């Protein structure tokens, strides 16, 4: 059997599935991707609404991710960079902090901010140096504790944790108690320190679109839902059965594979709301954090502070809510508007769109950075991919997709 005669199916056209297809193509195979929706991207999507570029959730691309450097053409994405810092809204005031070693304009605001003690600032410098010397593999071999325990053991003040670490990393981890593994904290902190947080000029969906554009021999079946996988067959929701020599599941597998039915993934959710405003209250390319406990809003960002492929007529503001507390969309919009006014001094907002994202990030235990291709194999002909296999990051999604494809290739070559 020639390479192109192998029927290799990939279920899911998210980042992992697209990377798997790319690796298979590079080795001479012609994979078939089955996607339930009408386009690639999975959770990485962008809409154009009334001339505004709206990502599905507040998502950034970290340029320091090794897998990003390997698989993406960052220049072609025209990445728009955030400044390395944050604007913190506290007690009806606005404070700016950041890394003056990377952007000198943040030096004076940081010194004047009153956020954290002098000792906290020294501890941040020490943490920066520690993680600079630490490999990613070493980070994921450390014993796990919660991020909160980790920060407390490093001696950061309660105020520093409350005002900066909690709102900033709650927005990344999508949980408000910093209960996420310290491995993930060290990994993300190191990646932020060694590169830039960015958004492609055309929105976050430019990432899967670029991966798609590089595929030449992969076939895509959109709007096609898989019911189950059994004995080398893919059974579609409409009853059609597809023969498959090898299948990579690059979506949640528990509902498709009988032996995984009791191992479903738990997910973290979030809600992102977009508003149109006349002016900005944050004049730099910085995320805005709410330090007050008990608020709905976790963070805000003026997307219009970065250059985009569209030309918005007014300022566009994104608001991230981690726990909407069961509120209806209408009630949520009203409470968020009230908080924007009371906490940030933002008035005269015009609502554009709301994205409720029930499966924003997977809840994972025993986080890993890497895996062998053989570790992606569930059965002789079935392989698993996705960030759920390693850790909740775009980097992990790419690595797992590559490893699953290599696992398939190893299986084929071992029997040839």
Question: What are the functions of these language-model segments?
Answer:
Residues 6-33:
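N-terminal Rossmann-like FAD-binding beta1-loop-alpha1 element of flavoenzymes
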Residues 15-16, 40, 400:
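Hydrophobic/small residue at the entry helix of a nucleotide-binding pocket
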Residues 25-49:
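Glycine-rich FAD pyrophosphate-binding loop
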Residues 46, 69-90, 157-163, 267, ...:
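A short alpha-helix-loop-beta-strand transition element characteristic
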Residues 50-130, 134-138:
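Dinucleotide-binding Rossmann-like beta1-alpha1 core, especially the glycine-rich loop
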Residues 126-232:
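Active-site/ligand-binding neighborhood in enzyme catalytic cores
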Residues 309-416:
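Conserved flavin/dinucleotide-binding core of flavoenzymes
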């Amino acid at each position: 059997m020639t390479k192109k005669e192998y029927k290799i199916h990939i279920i899911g056209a998210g980042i992992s599935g697209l990377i798997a297809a790319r690796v298979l193509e590079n080795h001479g195979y012609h994979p078939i991707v089955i996607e339930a929706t009408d386009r690639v991207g999975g959770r990485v999507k962008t809409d154009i609404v009334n001339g505004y570029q709206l990502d599905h959730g507040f998502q950034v691309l970290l340029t320091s991710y090794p897998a990003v450097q390997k698989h993406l053409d960052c220049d072609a994405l025209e990445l728009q960079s955030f400044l390395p810092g944050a604007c913190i809204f506290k007690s009806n005031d606005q404070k700016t902090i950041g890394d003056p070693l990377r952007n000198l304009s943040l030096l004076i605001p940081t010194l004047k901010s009153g956020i954290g003690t002098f000792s906290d600032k020294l501890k941040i410098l020490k943490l920066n140096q520690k993680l600079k010397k630490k490999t990613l593999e070493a980070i994921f071999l450390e014993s796990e504790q919660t991020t909160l325990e980790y920060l407390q053991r490093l001696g950061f003040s309660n105020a520093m944790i409350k005002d900066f670490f909690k709102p900033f990393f709650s927005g990344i981890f999508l949980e408000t108690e910093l209960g996420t593994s310290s491995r993930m904290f060290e990994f993300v902190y190191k990646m932020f320190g060694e590169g830039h947080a960015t958004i492609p000029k055309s929105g976050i969906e430019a990432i899967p679109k670029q991966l798609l554009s590089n595929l030449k021999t992969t076939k895509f079946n959109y709007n096609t839902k898989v019911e189950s996988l059994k004995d080398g067959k893919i059974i579609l929701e409409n009853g059609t059965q597809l023969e498959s020599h090898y299948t990579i599941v690059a979506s949640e597998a528990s509902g498709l594979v009988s032996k995984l039915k009791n191992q479903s993934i738990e997910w973290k959710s979030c809600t992102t709301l977009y508003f149109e405003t006349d002016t900005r209250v944050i004049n730099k390319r910085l995320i805005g954090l709410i330090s007050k406990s008990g608020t709905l809003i976790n963070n805000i960002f003026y997307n219009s502070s970065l250059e985009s492929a569209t030309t918005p007529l007014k300022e566009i503001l994104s608001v991230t809510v981690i726990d909407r507390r069961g509120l209806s969309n209408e009630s949520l919009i009203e409470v968020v508007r009230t908080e924007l006014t009371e906490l940030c001094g933002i008035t005269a907002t015009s609502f554009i769109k709301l994205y409720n994202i029930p499966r924003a990030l997977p809840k994972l235990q025993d986080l890993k950075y890497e895996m062998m291709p053989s570790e992606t194999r569930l059965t002789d002909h079935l392989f698993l991919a996705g960030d759920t296999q390693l850790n909740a990051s775009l980097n992990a999604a790419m690595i797992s997709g590559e490893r699953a494809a290599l696992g398939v290739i190893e299986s084929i070559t071992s029997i040839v």
